Regions:
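Catalytic cores of RNA-modifying enzymes
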Residues: 1-228, 232, 263, 274, ...
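C-terminal lobe and adjacent flexible extensions of AdoMet/dcAdoMet transferase-like proteins
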Residues: 212, 231-291
Length: 291
């Protein structure tokens, strides 16, 4: 491996690279490049990357964080959807021989196969500065597809990071909170203001670390059923749980069966989905499974 040092993350160097390639930001890809070395260091520290690690980076942009990851990890695979960035990445990463750039949509990449080839199927670490519009599908895809993951350390919209770690009874609590907390332990490790990016986003961001559980914190017989119940509960969050589930095509149970399942769990017929904990949703799914 080369002895090169990461040099991107400095606004001046970033502008030089963009001008050299006459790069135009693509709004449809939600591109905001990091230009703050302190934040980059914080992400690398929070991800707890060592020389034994294989790291998957989603959305490397011009390779700013990739340079830092390549310094810290054994090997990095960086998946970039924007074809116009590939020649830039080949240039900015030429001094690191432990980086593979993959020009593809992360939702179409077989990450399990990648982990098998690059890491003998052992758990990988995921690091990303995610476009806001696609945060949820990417995170849920990583969790639901049974990819072997140790942790996910990501930059997301502050509001999304908050939603991932809140509990019942708060306005931000929802299906994403429950899904993340079923698979991982979430921890916000840094708040990042808009001036740390180019171009500046309109909202604040946060770095959140999701440490994958070896086993989920609750026992549930049918995961898919539990998540269908959760989605139905929050699709009409102002309705009672009975009405929310009764009106949902995802939950094939009658009003009587719904009331019976709630009774088995000792839950009020007037309760709303937003009041239930993950454990209570698991109990409810198990009650439905036993009907």
């Amino acid at each position: 491996m080369s002895m090169a040092r990461p040099y991107l993350g400095d606004p001046k160097r970033t502008i030089e690279v963009l001008q050299k390639y006459n790069f135009a930001f693509q709004k449809r890809f939600g591109q905001n490049f990091l230009i703050d070395t302190h934040v980059l260091d914080k992400i690398i520290d929070s991800a707890q990357i060592t020389k034994d690690d294989f790291v998957l980076e989603i959305g490397p942009g011009i390779g700013t964080m990739t340079q830092y990851l390549a310094e810290a990890a054994r090997e990095v695979a960086a998946v970039e959807i924007d074809t116009t960035l590939i020649p830039i990445l080949q240039d900015t990463l030429k001094d690191w021989d432990n980086v593979t750039v993959i020009n593809n949509d992360i939702l179409k990449v077989d990450i399990r196969q990648l982990a098998l080839e690059k890491n003998q199927g052992r758990p990988i670490k995921v690091v990303a500065n995610l476009p806001y519009y696609i945060t949820t599908p990417i995170i849920m895809g990583l969790f639901e597809n049974q990819v072997p993951i140790d942790s996910i350390t990501i930059m997301v919209q502050k509001e999304v990071a908050d939603r991932m770690q809140v509990g019942p009874g708060t306005k931000d609590y929802g299906a994403l909170s429950l899904a993340v907390q079923y698979y991982a332990k979430p921890q916000i490790v840094a708040n990042v203001p808009p001036n740390c990016f180019m171009p500046r986003p309109k909202v604040g961001s946060a770095v959140i670390r999701l440490e994958r559980y070896a086993e989920p914190p609750v026992e549930v017989k049918d995961e898919k059923l539990m998540f269908r119940i959760i989605r139905a509960s929050f699709n009409q969050r102002r309705k009672t749980l009975v009405n929310g589930l009764k009106n949902s095509p995802e939950v094939p149970f009658s009003k009587e069966q719904i009331e019976e399942a709630l009774g088995m769990c000792g839950l009020s017929l007037n309760i709303r989905g937003e009041a239930l904990t993950l454990e209570q949703f698991a109990q409810l799914a198990n009650a439905f499974s036993s009907l």
